[in-house]
Amino acid sequence: MHHARRALLDWHGALIAGSNTDAANRLIQAYAEELGVGKCSVAGTSQKAFTRAAAFINGTVSHISEFDDIFRDGAYHPACPTISAVYALAESRDDSVEHLLAAMIVGYEVSTRISKVIQPSHYEFFHTTGTVGVFGAAAACSYLLGLNAAQACDALSTAGTFASGLQQAFRSDSMTKPMHPGHAAEVGLNAALVAQAGMTGTPDLLEGDAGFGAALSKNPRWNELFEDLGKSWNIEHITFKNHGCCGHNFPAIDAVSHLLNDHPIRSENIAQIRVGGYRATSEVCKYVHPKTAFEAKFSLTYTVSARIVLGRVREKAFLADALANLEIYALEDKVVLRIDQECTNKFPIHRSAKVEIEMKDGSVYAHHQHTRHGDPDEPLTDQELLDKFIELTEPRIGAQQAKIISEQLLGNQAHAVRDLAKLWSNRSH
């Protein structure tokens, strides 16, 4: 249960971090007619909404800042679709935090298992968080509603027919990408509600000849879906982001951090930075000299250079003054990315990078980062997770409220979801 509390804390951080962004403000404007009703809290406004609208908005907003958690083996962000949906449902029903946490565990388990067996081919064209996220939301909401097995099957199979999210949304500076988990949250929640009312689904939706697997994966391994079921929970094996950008940048950033800690490296003395990574790094994190925060978050050259110049790759690295930093700009031209076959072969189970920093005096410092800091095999401590949460939330809701939320979640003090939501809903805008 502690792992679920960590996930819920981290989701709150990502949600609040995205709440005062331009994208969130535009989304609130678009949903103006659906606000001021219902019982559910919405990030970015003090107005309430009905469950479906809250699920969509919070699912979107919690993905905007790129700080949400990851299930590495499935190239999937479970928190945004899963928690956003079941949180709205729990708040509308005045449910307990304990019940919410249990539902989260179920939603994470179902969706992460599906995400794992459809990779790596699924990720070539599809945003797993949008596609598989519908199952996380549907499973969590089905549990919270107390649906029986047949009803839960109907919910999952109905949700799966609405799975969507294309990788092309990553390839340009648009606001579409974060709406993928928002849509997944709304779809999954709606599927559970209609299943409760008796709407039936297609039982063989996953493995059918024209089903989810056939359409969205070259080699779905459904025979592996139930491997080790009951031995552990996948929510215990979640990656929590240590940097505020696309996770494909992380191995290189972490490798650079290792080298900076061990060697006297100054940016003005660097001749070249050579990065060996897996294919998704070059395909997704492709921007050089980014002009916007979005592009910067999907730029390997920028994030690596920002780590050297600024010391961290958190929110401040994506502000206007950082994007205009001439030292970062100059250093980007020294970053060379190549596809490393060893790193490619390990993807998606391991996200790795090989970094060499060559100095102007000819010395070369090298490090092979086998995993990301924050991955299950190198997890963030509770204190590191808390530090991240405080950094993201304190400027927006104040130090006192941030402290109370973290203490309630990590200290097992939170009881009612509505009471928990009150701590941020009137301040995250």
Q: How would you describe each model-predicted region?
A:
Residues H3, A30, E98-V110, A150-T158, ...:
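Extended, well-ordered alpha-helical scaffold segments
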Residues V61-K116:
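Hydrophobic alpha-helical hairpins/lids featuring a short glycine-rich hinge
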